[in-house]
Amino acid sequence: FNKSIIIRKYIDTKAANSIIKKINTSGEKMLQIGQIAEVRITDVNHMGKGVGKINDFVVFIDNTISGDYVQIQIFDIKKNYAEGKLIKIIEKSTDRIESPCSFYHQCGGCQLMHMSYEQQLIYKKNRVINELRRAGVNLEGINIYDTIGMDTPFRYRNKTAFFTAQKDKTIIMGPYEQGTYNTVNISNCLLQSEAADKAFGVIRKAIAKYNIAAYDKKTGNGF
């Protein structure tokens, strides 16, 4: 290898083939697509993904937070980082909670609902500090105040974006699945108001009653 070799891979996820994509950055250690590994999560990045390392190579993993010790499977490798899918949590972070949303692990609308709200506020403050430093701002002598939280961190959004799709001759409605354009069929959202939930239900019934077609990205037709 020179500095690295990247083999472009096209996967049929149902086939679970074993095409391998490798990268060599140290001349000694390599990762492979499909590789199983155990990782300690030490940080959370700006996308809400947990950050860990395998042989000093950075790996990002969804649905993990600082303090988690997890088993993952590598599914993508770039020049400077890899991405892994969470298989199981071996040791939970003390800041990890069970999400109150039954759609959370499918929906792409939220990234931190498995993190305690107190820790979310700390994460947001640290993100501001990190972004300012990354932009070259000298923070010496500057006090960054703590994030001001809410008494109840739910039902606060006045705008949400939901999409329609055709599935088994039925129209489904909801947000996109995380990292895809696949619509997740939901009945409510804990971030929007209860009035918005009711309006969502009315629209769903109207679509079914009047046999309105789901939006088709190719033709531009539908709702």
Region roles according to the model:
Residues 18, 23-223:
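Accessory RNA-recognition modules of RNA-modification enzymes
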